[in-house]
């Protein structure tokens, strides 16, 4: 009886939208957040049908991440839907393109050219069984294997030129009266989604949610806000014709994590982060030379890139720095005590200027 080798079925590659690639963790569709360091702790990018929550403190650093998120979407021909905010003026404040190319693209290109081919591959080949010699060598996908054009670098000192072909929409404000204050917001979103072509990537941006500047007092009540979050979460996860992702910021100084609104928001969210700024002291030419605060991870949609567990505590203490060109997240280390060292140096170099104690009784 003869046996025939069973060949693997050939599967046609799926056509991904622009700015979307497969995750190396579970092959989900992910897209860039606009910040390469933020993408690293998101295991390459934001998964589709995700709701990200950023809890901001007294400083408005969370708006930088939201602007990077929206600017990246416009550069990738994605559709932007802006929640209750200052309106179309918000799009004029988006960061523009940076003159410096992205580090990821440079590193990928350098890695491809810096490793020359081996002169004698027969000497370096591992001696294994003959039946395994023809097996193709596969490389595990890493975060460095980023396709060109997946992410862009932006400059906060410049403004993005919003072209006529860029599609975006602005939501109206919630009502101050009525049984459902968020009815015009949901109607605006569903009407906008119905006009999009199937397969479009739509990014939802909700800056300073629950802020009294954009939301009425009635809209901040738990019974209305929880209903709105449930409706928004179901739209993000159940809409099949359009790929939705949402990023919102919440002022933690007005609504703590213990209140009912934030409790349900974190439970329904795919990822939760919080920013805790430091008091800024040292600056050089108007630029901050130290981390601006702590960046804490409370919840993640995927496991961390350096572990196989979806445990946010594995990241350790992180800090963030906002410069002219990027929002950087890196491990936080306590700085040296420069003030005490300067005082000791001054006292050693200038002994005459030290105050002389009186010895008279």
Swiss-Prot record:
Its main location: cytoplasm. Pathway: tRNA modification; 5-methoxycarbonylmethyl-2-thiouridine-tRNA biosynthesis. Residues 93-124, 338-361 are annotated as: Disordered. The keyword Protein biosynthesis does not apply. Keywords: Cytoplasm, Nucleus, tRNA processing. The keyword tRNA processing applies. InterPro entries: Elongator_complex_protein_4, P-loop_NTPase. Pfam families: PAXNEB (PF05625). Belongs to the ELP4 family. Component of the elongator complex. This is Elongator complex protein 4. It comes from Schizosaccharomyces pombe (strain 972 / ATCC 24843).
């Amino acid at each position: 009886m003869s046996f025939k080798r069973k060949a693997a079925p050939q599967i046609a590659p799926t056509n991904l939208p622009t700015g979307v690639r497969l995750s190396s963790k579970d092959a989900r569709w992910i897209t860039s957040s606009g910040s390469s360091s933020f993408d690293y702790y998101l295991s390459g990018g934001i998964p589709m049908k995700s709701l990200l929550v950023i809890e901001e403190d007294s400083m408005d650093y969370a708006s930088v991440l939201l602007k990077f998120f929206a600017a990246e979407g416009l550069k990738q021909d994605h559709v932007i839907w802006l929640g209750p905010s200052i309106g179309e003026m918000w799009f004029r404040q988006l960061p523009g393109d940076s003159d410096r190319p992205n580090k990821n693209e440079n590193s990928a290109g350098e890695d491809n050219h810096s490793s020359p081919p081996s002169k004698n591959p027969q000497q370096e080949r591992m001696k294994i069984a003959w039946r395994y010699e023809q097996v193709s060598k596969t490389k595990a996908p890493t975060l460095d294997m980023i396709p060109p054009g997946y992410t862009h670098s932006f400059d906060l000192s410049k403004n993005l030129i919003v072209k006529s072909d860029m599609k975006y929409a602005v939501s109206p404000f919630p009502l101050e009266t009525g049984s459902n204050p968020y009815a015009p917001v949901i109607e605006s979103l569903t009407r906008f989604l119905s006009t999009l072509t199937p397969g479009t990537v739509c990014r939802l941006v909700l800056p300073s949610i629950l802020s009294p500047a954009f939301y009425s007092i009635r809209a901040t009540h738990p019974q209305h806000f929880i209903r709105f979050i449930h409706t928004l979460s179901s739209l993000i996860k159940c809409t099949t014709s359009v790929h939705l992702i949402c990023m919102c910021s919440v002022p933690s100084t007005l609504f703590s994590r213990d209140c009912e609104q934030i409790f349900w928001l974190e439970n329904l969210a795919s990822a939760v982060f919080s920013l805790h700024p430091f008091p800024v002291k040292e600056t050089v030419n108007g630029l901050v030379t130290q981390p601006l605060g702590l960046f804490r991870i409370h919840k993640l949609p995927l496991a961390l890139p350096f572990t196989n567990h979806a445990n946010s505590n594995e990241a350790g203490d992180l800090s963030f720095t906002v410069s002219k060109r990027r929002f950087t997240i890196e491990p936080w280390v306590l700085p040296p005590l420069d003030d005490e060292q300067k005082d000791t140096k001054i006292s050693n170099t200038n002994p005459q200027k030290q105050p002389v104690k009186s010895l008279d009784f």
